[in-house]
């Protein structure tokens, strides 16, 4: 596929994906979902990857879904549009390696929902966050009502969802919506640093710990603990054994 909206760039074992529709503040449309589906199924499936970074070009991460594309949809078409977006974002969250949202500027509506589908979020201090759908007489359609309370708690989530108010980066950090805040000019440097730290760890362990943590969050503690024990054991005789030997021998592991 020839990408027109996404700009994927391989940097060693990292994949940097820039959403490049700055003239529309990177608003999400059908073409975006087509390209992201292809990227996740192909570029992001490379076993040599250690992390994926998603960011936006220009003044916004993503300012929301493309309202001009949605306005004339029938209820049936709107449901299909919602289901399609949910599937794409689910594929992002279930990608084998960690996915980091580098949030510059506005992350609103569908843009915040995409950020929620990532494993964690790093923001510049001029970023703004919100689920403003109620201002248009709508609700989120890409699982925002489900992921947001799971991440920040029911009270803060319902406040954002029912008021449509925007949060500053400082507020987002306070409630756990983002993990770090930087100066705008330092955002990508910090995200690349974090991705580099991840790349230095045992790659099989990183993939497994993401899988077990996400899967375990959806089942009982007993079921999640069983999954953890099974996954823990898979690393013995492989990279886990190499890592422990390297520690004892005071050398760097050879993954």
Please provide the spans of the model-predicted regions.
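C-terminal alpha-helix plus adjacent terminal tail
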Residues: 1-12, 46, 164-170, 185, ...
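Phosphate-coordinating loops and pocket residues in cytosolic domains that bind phosphorylated ligands
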Residues: 27-30, 63, 72, 162, ...
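Crotonase-fold acyl-CoA enzyme core
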Residues: 91-204, 251
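Conserved CoA-thioester-binding segment of acyl-CoA-metabolizing enzymes
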Residues: 1-57, 90
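Glycine- (often His-adjacent) and acidic-residue-rich active-site loop
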Residues: 45-48, 56-91, 107, 219-220, ...
